[in-house]
Amino acid sequence: MDRLSQLPTLRITPTKKLTLTYRGKNYQGVAGDTLATALYANGIRIFSRSIKYHRPRGLYSLNGESGNCLMEVDATPNIRTEQTPLRNGMIVVPQNVIGTPEWDFMGIMDMFHWAMPAGFYYKIFHKPYWLWPFFMGIIRKAAGIGRINPSRREGRSDELYLNCEVCVVGGGPAGISAALTAAGKGLRVILLEARPWLGGFYDYRTIEYTKGVPLYKRAVQLVEQVEDTPDVRIFPHTSLIGFYNNNLITARQKGHEKDSFDERYIEIRAQSVVVATGCTERPLIFENNERPGVMQIGCAHRLAQTYGLLPGKYAVFSVGHDLGLEAAIDLSGLGLNVLCVADSRSDGQDPELLEKLTKINIPVLKGWVASKAHGKKHIKKVTLSAIEGTKHKDFLCDLLVASTGLTNARSPIFLTQAKMVHDPDSGLFVPKKLPNKVYVAGRFLGFHDPLSIETSGELAGLAAAIDCGVSAKSQAKEVKRRLEDMPGPIRASQFTRIPGRGAHDFICFDEDVTIQHIHQAYEMGFDNAELAKRFTAAGTGPTQGGISGHNLPLVISQYNADSDGSIVPTTVRPPLTPTLLGTYAGRNPNPYKQTPLHETQKNSGAVFHRMGVWKRARYFSKDYSARDEIENVRNNVGLIDVSTLGKFRVFGPDSVKALERVYVGDMSSIPEGKVKYSAMCNDDGCLIDDGVITRRGVNDYYLTTSTGRSGVTVEWIRYHTRYDGWDFHIVNLTEVYGAINLAGPRAREVFQKITDTNLSNEAFPFMGYREFTLKDTVPVRVMRLGFVGELSYEIHIPASYTQTVWEWLLGAGEEFGICPFGLEAQNALRLEKGHVIIGQESEIRTTLHDLGLGFLLYRKKHEANTVGVFALKNTEYQQGRLKLVGFKMDSPLKTPHDGSVVVDSEIRGYICTARYSYTLGESIGLALVESHLAKKGTQLEIFDAGAGNKRLYAKVVSTSFYDAEGKRLRM
């Protein structure tokens, strides 16, 4: 399509070509285009198919009030293409079609519209009940518009938190005037505008502002002034998300191509707020009013003046306000063949505009409206009808510009809990009373005259400044007096539609809701707009009432024969603008801690996994089954990085008392050179951590905790000893020391090669602790433990030497087949041994007794007041608690997923960990089950989502599946 390239109002650069891919085919647009205008320029007229009937939908508005132009863009679904700037290389895919938008197989649904009356989904499909799962699957597949694309790249998000004296919402003439006025009083002002540029509805209009100055030039003047005002911070392409108490505003800004973000979340705390969001158009309701080729006045006008695209060749206008007459004159002058202008008003038109239409031979039919658009995929003919009488006229055309009135963009004010009432003169919903320090201005109040619009903005800016402590009451009175002498709000048409059957007269494009549906709902008793909205789903689609928000209350009021005062709009809730969850999350720098061995493991092919604040090696194998790692530890020797374990030194005269307070075991009996396994509980006796403690000297202890508790252990101990006045100190050494667990039957042989210390079973037994040096150089602290069920040495090394020791061990173990192993292998190995992991075999209600760890409780330390001991004693024999059991699957190759539930007629427990054991050749696991199922030999019935309706079966066994006597730990 040829562009109108010489217009002074253009926002495009016709010489700068950009490419996009649509349905696998390359198209060209130009810089400044939106995706929708670029596609329109390339002859695309059907942009989508409707959600229920799969009717063709085309470009209708450029403001995002309808879901007609939702598409998948660069793997992101539900993008409003009419508001999305074109960027080079964009990949666009249509949504909600089987086939193509032009030939959609599901278009057959339109033939069965009679079978889908209002609320049909509430009344069928649930009887007989056993058919519901079948229908549910079909409905879920059919529902929705866009689909999540797993290949979508992660978006770039940002966040900004601001405060100001005055926040102005809306960058049109009223908003700019308010911002300039407030800034002129020395206040900091933030100006938000949804479009990529300022100017509002002045921006594309050529009608005169004053003699010799068209409106678009006045827009340029205002924009230059506000951009040159240092106290005004402007955020273009920024849409409101929410408006909350005490003037807290949230917004979403779309990033420019050169910005470092795709979307930015903005939160603003303002002393005063001015809302100058202007008006949108109220759709005319008639048969096939959503066919491609039907569009709003502003859409047709801006296509030409802003993007250089004539919206059609032969056009008919059906309007209800003077902007429609103005657009018809303007577009006719640009080359559009305007066949006729139908105006729903019988009088009240601007005589100057009527005279211009007469001069250019465009007939005007007063008291007429469009009653039907003809054509299956695009309009080919329009029928106009007299509102009073039975006269009809047909016009062959490819464009119908239709709008019956204006409605203010009231959603931001609605969120402030302001009571909105219907004004019968302006036809708008206006606030009866505004919250403190909130003001409205401009077309929002129904002003149409440019000077009135700007003056109302000036008045709102002064009122906001006065709220901020500025002395300007006398000036505000003068401005108010001037405004009263200017043209006030114009009288608007209340017309919605010509009475008829209404089967294809759409009131809500998003949800395929027709006038017939609204009437059906009304007859069933849903006799107010809010109830009708819920029952028919009108206004609940992607645009949340954008198209239907004003007409629905008017239609219901007509059924009720209500007076204007009882016309109530439907509720508006945030977010006002669809916003990615990633945008709410803000920047995603993904901060994490890494161990001293991170790069070394990375170079060895480790696949990492986020564990709390750390990144740890999940596996080194070809897949996460880690079979080779498991078998190597069982048969030879392996090493794992355990630097993330919490490491603490507790020392001082009262250190034992402090440890006794938080650990359930007897801390006073720990000898030097030995380690003790113990646990911490909360006040309810529920397990929160486990670890080992050793005594290094008199009143000097070294202890380890789980990775998850390493960051809070100091605070936990301090909190529970805060009133005792004890003399002790605690030092967090977690990041001071790295740690390596060397495990396997050949571990002693490997370790002995890098130290002269005697590592024999007699000199360094199981659960022993030693401090010595490696190669006479590196001091280490070593514990002989057995978490994975093999001979193991947990080596704690000064962090800067950890990589060196890792390399020494790999070198020393080369002849024994040493290999690193990760968390997946460790998880399987410890499961075979029956060792628990806090948070995996436990949850917040799980006690020591539930896990079979009651032996850790030392019952004779009466004066220690240990956290959780009282609860542990009282719950030891409590009925109805879940108990930890081991189980083996009846079918060795069937392994339930973690989190699967144990059932009979009800849920009786859940699977904590289950794996296929390559060591044992069968599937094993640990589960928490009700006590009557905890006896060995009991059969468990398991529901696993991956098994469908089939049940899996297992038998309860000991929790120790491998080396129950512990011989391999002590070898």
Regions found by a protein language model. Give the residues of each.
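Residues forming the flavin
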Residues: 2-590, 736
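Conserved, structured C-terminal
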Residues: 598, 602-603, 616, 697-971
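A short, contiguous, amphipathic alpha-helix enriched in charged residues
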Residues: 35-47, 648, 653-670, 749, ...
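Short amphipathic beta-strand starts and helix->beta connectors
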Residues: 425, 490-493, 628-635, 680-690, ...
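Acidic, proline/glycine-enriched N-terminal capping motif
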Residues: 532-535, 551, 558-681, 686
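Short beta-strand segments
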Residues: 25-27, 78-79, 266-268, 393-395, ...
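Structural motif
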Residues: 22, 73, 611, 683, ...
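Residues forming anionic-ligand binding surfaces in small-molecule and nucleic-acid pockets
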Residues: 279, 526, 627-643, 687-700, ...
